[in-house]
């Protein structure tokens, strides 16, 4: 269930709201992306996260090594660490590794378990049209609050704790989903991962399609 959600047609629209929510962090900031690239977008986020880390906010960044192989490196990790920001590399790239295709395609930012961002927008300047790669860049994003945001926080914590020696504390504030919320709709936060062999996404899509009575709309860059 949700208190409020917002849909963004472009990364350009999402980015200012994301920065405002980062500035509001009081307990923790979780960042998990397939691609992180230095530039206007990332530098603005790092400036805020560094200040928050100095204030005692727990800031954690997780990125996919293959997705960010040409845009983010050990020196960037070192700089984050020096600023008090914890950082984990998902599945470090090893040539001829049998695990090469096990990638973290998640794109999400969570603040205090009360607000979360996700969608198709990575942390790179082309996603906010500050840099042109293939013409005007179109990727959607969304912002959720309340229980769905807490769900994203739990997803992050589970993945982080599997790959880091600095686990997310058990006592962190996650909204109790049993607490009633004023809603006018329904949002379910879910994920697939190497720890889940049930193909959650596939089953959900098939279930939704099976219940369709008039139409089914798809929006995807890949078929």
What would you call each of these model-derived segments?
Residues 3-223:
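Charged, low-complexity intrinsically disordered terminal segments
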């Amino acid at each position: 269930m949700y208190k409020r959600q917002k849909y963004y047609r472009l990364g350009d629209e999402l980015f200012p709201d994301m920065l405002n929510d980062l500035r509001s962090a009081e307990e923790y900031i979780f960042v998990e992306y397939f691609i992180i690239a230095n530039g206007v977008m990332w530098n603005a986020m790092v400036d805020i996260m560094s200040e928050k880390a100095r204030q005692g906010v727990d800031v954690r960044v997780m990125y996919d090594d293959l997705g960010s192989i040409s845009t983010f490196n050990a020196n960037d990790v070192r700089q984050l660490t020096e600023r008090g920001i914890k950082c984990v590399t998902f599945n470090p790239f090893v040539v001829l590794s049998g695990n090469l295709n096990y990638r973290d395609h998640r794109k999400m930012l969570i603040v205090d378990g009360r607000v979360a961002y996700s969608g198709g927008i990575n942390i790179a300047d082309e996603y906010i049209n500050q840099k042109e790669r293939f013409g005007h860049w179109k990727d959607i994003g969304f912002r959720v609050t309340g229980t769905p945001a807490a769900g994203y926080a739990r997803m992050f914590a589970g993945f982080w704790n599997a790959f880091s020696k600095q686990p997310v504390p058990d006592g962190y504030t996650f909204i109790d989903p049993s607490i009633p919320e004023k809603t006018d709709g329904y949002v379910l936060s879910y994920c697939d991962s190497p720890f889940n062999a049930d193909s959650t996404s596939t089953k959900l899509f098939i279930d939704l399609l099976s219940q369709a009575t008039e139409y089914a709309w798809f929006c995807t860059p890949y078929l």
